[in-house]
Amino acid sequence: MKEFLIGLLVVFLSFILVLIFNALKAKLTARKLTKRNEHKTKEEQIEYAKRLSEMIKCETVSKEGSYDDTEFKKLRNVMENLFPNIHKSAEKMTFSDDCWIYKIKGKDESRNIILMSHHDVVAVTGEWLHPGFCGEIFDDSLWGRGTVDTKTPLFAEFQALEDLLSEGFVPECNVYIGSSHNEEIGGDGIPEALKYFKENNITFETVLDEGGAIISPPLAGIKANCAMMAIHEKGRYTLNCYAKDTSGHKGLTANKNTPVARMSAFITEVNTKNLFIKRLYPEVKGMFTHLCPYAPFIMTLLFSNLWCFGSLLKTLMPKLNAQAGAMVGTTCTFNDINTNKEEKYCHAKAFLRPVYESDLKEDLKQIEKIAKKYNIELVPAENNECFKTTDVNSKSVEYTKKCINEIFPDVIPAPYILPAGTDARHLCSISESVIRFAPIEMNDKQFASVHSENEHISLDSIANSVVFYKHYLKNYR
């Protein structure tokens, strides 16, 4: 018995030592964070902001089912005036109503990269401290719809290339800039451009779009901001759900099994049951691996030993918040619920966001079981899609991290899964490396202003974005 207890103690101590060893090993991988140099003077920051403000003043709101070119034409004129070198040197193509594709030829014309940021915005609603399209500077920030999402990255891409061209720069490979006019409504801009790329056998070594940024740390206890790079985007899958009634006139029966009642029960059960597969996907593990060396020791211990604590984490993450839950499995939202006057049928749409297509197939089986229970017919909508992920260790991801470290030495780069949507998803079929990261730095208020009131961005963030893209293009090999 004594030998057994001693053996048990040895096993337990060995287990603890392994946990501590892995945590210490992770701590040793932490890069020393250093103070950032001011890349631009205050006067230069203000000058960039004034130029960007001309773009912000263009009210390029995209709307479902209609297109008015007035404000979009105004923006095109602004771009031509602001960036004459690009418009003189680049080949420009337009797809759909106003999706721009610019191409600057490189030394090696067989290779291509593309920088992206859409130029449409959502409508200004709610109460703002300053007019929604004022494009004016207050408290060292530029205010207006699009300053964060995403005219600042678009401006920075153009300004960086404009500056480089004025210096006689010739890129190592072809450099494209893509900007759609209807990203916010899931429009046809980039999909139309994709047809052209495929017809001409154009592929991209790297796609760099919006979707990530420099934000407050997502893990408690980390004292530096984090450059979150989305290397995967959740898929989109819509199910039309139908409940029908064959019982005759509802007023002549006491039937409680109505289409509305059955649909309500179906939706309730799908929403309340833990139906879907939960996993710690490689992209999420990569996020923890990159962030945990900078966290307090107990957090490092947890995240550096996912072999031990992974099951616990994938159970806890959905309980932390919706965004954390979205990274470990499929989410399902019901909308467009309607019935006819006689309540002879009820229709609802189930909008699913899977991480991987393989998991979606299993998740759909769970929904189908519940649908059968309530006699609900399920019909998949058209244009359902899942997207290819980017290898966290790919050359493009490593290069992007390198540029972040060099321009923002006080920031921690990390990959993650994007639960929202970008234009970049359309190019997954013609690129092995699709990265969703814009080098804008936001505090919590600025992050919360996306698609909300009081959207604004700091002047130094605008300038640093230009510096980042210039560095990225100049050193791309």
Question: Model-predicted segments: where are they?
Answer:
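Feature marks short, highly hydrophobic, charge-poor N-terminal signal-anchor/signal peptide-like helices
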Residues: M1-V10
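Acidic/His- and Gly-rich active-site-bordering loop/insert found
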Residues: F12-T147, E167-P171
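An extended, acidic, His-containing surface patch that forms the Zn2+-binding/catalytic region
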Residues: K92-M93, D108, I215-S216, F276-K344, ...
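A common structural junction motif
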Residues: H119-D120, V270-L275, E368-I376
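Acidic/histidine-rich catalytic neighborhood of metal-dependent amide-processing enzymes
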Residues: L142, V148-M228
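Short amphipathic alpha-helical face segments that pack within enzyme cores
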Residues: T152-D163, R262-A265, N464-F468
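Midchain, well-structured core segments that form catalytic/ion-binding scaffolds
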Residues: P191, E199-K361
